[in-house]
Amino acid sequence: MNAQTHTVLDLVRQELRSFAGYSSARSVALTGDLWLNANESAWPNPADSHATMRRYPEPQPPKLRQMLAALYGCLPEQVLIGRGSDEGIDLLVRAVCEPRRDPVLVTPPVFGMYAVSAQLQNAPLIQVPLVDDAAGFHADVPAIITAAQTSRAKLVFLCSPSNPVGAAIPLQQIETILQTLAGTALVVVDEAYGEFSDVPSVVPLLARYPHLVVLRTLSKAHALAAVRIGSVIADAHLVAVLRRCQAPYPLPTPCVSLAEQGLSAAALHVTAQRVAEIRAERERLRAALACLSGVRRVYPSQGNFLLVRFDDAEAAFQALYAAGVVVRDQRAAPQLHDALRLTVGTPEQNTRLLAVLRDIQAVPA
């Protein structure tokens, strides 16, 4: 191993660096035509009409792994497939952070699972708030670097585009963080909404920064949220460690099959068209919302959603709810006491949302 690889593995908990994990029946490379090694049923379930569900699934299906690597621009051995990005977050925290010792750094207001996983691991949580100014929310890069160095954080989570605020971090700023924290922390960039963004993916930076980790998912742009397929893209040696910490059979066969179909050339073509439509609708919706008298601010977004501040967020939420429109209440989040997050829907759905909010304006106070 080279010095860089040693540095990456040095960030893993010492007792897990040589941890063998569980050796499942499917993890052993064997061939044969009569499989009696996993105590599976010799008969299919009556509900299994195609008789394909009685065997345990591949832990990391090679075909899907190759398809995801091609999609994200990396090598198959740099991809760990898991149950959504949530599993990747949890695996990283458990593999890297010693309880009560190794901090996790987050940038609120932000996706809550980073903090949840840190708390479950009893890892100290360092919070560096996003800055809200005339241009919108943005990451405070100098403060992130200072806090990470001072606290000796082992994991730095950067959500880009950020949920719920919609801001993406420029690649140059992420590279500055990577350069400064080399050898001391894994820098995890969550690109769950990357397909909707003008900012390119950071995956190519992995060639220069082995302590970079990227999270991707099929839940958003690819419309496969129920399939629960997420990817951790990282140094191959780190991926191998995370795999040994993962459950033996994390990926149900039906989910793998749907994911493979969803990544076909034809499906990817449709996805690209829908992403373009969502981006266009996002800007239409943003402009229309900004014209409503009860709206204080509509933030620019690189995701498939908009963060909106209201004069009376409770009234807006309740009016939408009464009309059958459910949006995400963000008022409990730091800095967002008056904000709702609105997912960009179809043109018809967005028009319906706007109609309800316009009706609020028409009602006398």
UniProtKB/Swiss-Prot annotation:
UniProt key word ATP-binding: no
Gene Ontology biological process: L-histidine biosynthetic process
UniProt keyword terms in alphabetical order: Amino-acid biosynthesis, Aminotransferase, Histidine biosynthesis, Pyridoxal phosphate, Transferase
GO molecular-function terms, A-Z: histidinol-phosphate transaminase activity; pyridoxal phosphate binding
Transferase keyword on record: yes
Annotated positions of the N6-(pyridoxal phosphate)lysine modification: 220
UniProt-listed InterPro entries: Aminotransferase_I/II_large, HisP_aminotrans, PyrdxlP-dep_Trfase, PyrdxlP-dep_Trfase_major, PyrdxlP-dep_Trfase_small
EC number: 2.6.1.9
Cofactor(s), names only, from the UniProt record: pyridoxal 5'-phosphate
Pathway: Amino-acid biosynthesis; L-histidine biosynthesis; L-histidine from 5-phospho-alpha-D-ribose 1-diphosphate: step 7/9
Reactions listed under catalytic activity: L-histidinol phosphate + 2-oxoglutarate = 3-(imidazol-4-yl)-2-oxopropyl phosphate + L-glutamate
Top class in the EC scheme: transferase
Subunit-structure text: Homodimer.
Similarity-based family: Belongs to the class-II pyridoxal-phosphate-dependent aminotransferase family. Histidinol-phosphate aminotransferase subfamily.
Protein known as: Histidinol-phosphate aminotransferase
The species this protein was found in: Xylella fastidiosa (strain Temecula1 / ATCC 700964)
Lineage, top ranks: Bacteria, Pseudomonadati, Pseudomonadota, Gammaproteobacteria, Lysobacterales
Record gene name: hisC
